[in-house]
Amino acid sequence: MTKLQHPIVIIFGAGASRGGLDKVPGVPPPVDRDFFDIANQLVGHGTPKLTKKVLNDVWQLYSRTNGIGLETYYRELETRAIIGEFAKTANQPKDWGRRQKDLEELIRRVYVHTTVFDTQAVTVNPKKSEIHKKILEKLEPKDIIITFNYDLVIEESFSSARLWNLIDGYGIQTSGKTKGWAKRWLSDKEYINGEKSKISLLKLHGSLNWKSYNGTTIRLKPKPYLVSTRKGKIRFEKILILAPGWNKRVDKNPYKKFWREARLQLEKCKTLMILGYSLPETDLLAHSLLAEVVRTRAARDDFLKQLYLADPNESVKERFVELFTPALGPHGKVFRYHDVEEFSKKIYE
C-alpha cells in the first residue's frame, strides 16, 4: 500500500459502526434505511413497548414501516410540528411533539442496545470493534477524527489513552470524569493524569455520553448505556445530540466550535479517509461543509494527496470522487474499498 501521508482526517459514518460490529454477536448498529427494522429486533427495559408505539406512528403516516428511513420520518415530524404551530387546524391536531420525543428516546436506545453485549447486566460490557482498533492504531499526533455518529464505538475502540482521552479529546473540555463510564474508561485505557490528547475526535452531531453543555464544558453522562423503566413506564434519558432533522443548529455552541474546527482540518489535511459515510442528499449542512472545503482547496491549489473511500455502494464512492476531484488536482490518488473491513486489512499491507 502507498505510504499514508499525515495529517489525516478520517470521517466515520453509520456504515463504519455497522461494519465494525457486524461480526460481533447481537443485533448490529443501524444505518438510516434499516433503523426501524433494527429497532423492532431489540428486547428488554421497555424498548419493545416504545418501538411498537413509534412504529404505529410511522404506520399512520405511510401505511408501512419497511423502507422508511430514520431521517425521512424525523424530518416529516419536525416540519409538521412547525406547520402546526403557525397554521393551526380547525380540527383536532396531532401531537407531533410527543412523536418527536418518543423517536428521540428510541434513537438513543437503539444505539445503546446495538453497541453493548447485554443491557440487562449489572455492569454493561460494550462491544469492541477490532476494525476500528486497527484503523485508530495508524493515527499519529495532529490527525483528526470526524464523525456524525452518536455511538461510542470509536471511544471504546482506542487501545489506550496514549493518543486520545475523553478529558480534552473532544475539542472541548469535559467534566464528570470521576464517575461511572468516564472513570472506567480512563482506568481501562491506563490514562496518566495530566496527559493531553494528541488527536481530536469531533462529534458533529453530539454523543450518547454527553449530558449537557454549560457554555464552556460538556458534562459527561456517568451511565450513557442506561436503558430502563420506572414503575413500568419507559424512562427517558437526556443526551446532548442534534436529532436527524433538517433544522440542526450547528451555528450554536458547542457544535459551532466542532464544525469550525472540522472545516479547518479538512482544508489542510494531506489524506482524507471516508469510511461508511454516504453523504445523504438530505444532509445539506454536510454537503455544504465538504463543498466549501473543496472550493477553498481548489482555489489555493492546495490539493489532497490521498483520498480513501470504503463503502459497499459503488455509487457512494463515485459521488465522493466527483465531489473531491477539484481538490485532488492532477496527482491526487484515490483508493476504493468494498467496506471498512477490507480497508482495515489493506492499510497494513
Q: How would you describe each model-predicted region?
A:
Residues 48, 52-54, 213-267:
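Acidic, metal/cofactor-coordinating or nucleic-acid-engaging core segments within structured domains
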Residues 1-166, 343:
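Gly/serine-rich nucleotide phosphate-binding loop at the start of the catalytic core
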Residues 161-175, 276:
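A short alpha->loop->secondary-structure connector
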Residues 207:
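Carbohydrate-associated surface elements
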Residues 1-20, 29-33, 45-46, 248-349:
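SIR2/sirtuin-family catalytic core signature
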Residues 156-159, 212-221, 284-287:
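A short secondary-structure junction signal
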Residues 124-131, 178-189, 245-264:
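A Trp-anchored, charged/polar loop motif used as the substrate-binding/catalytic surface
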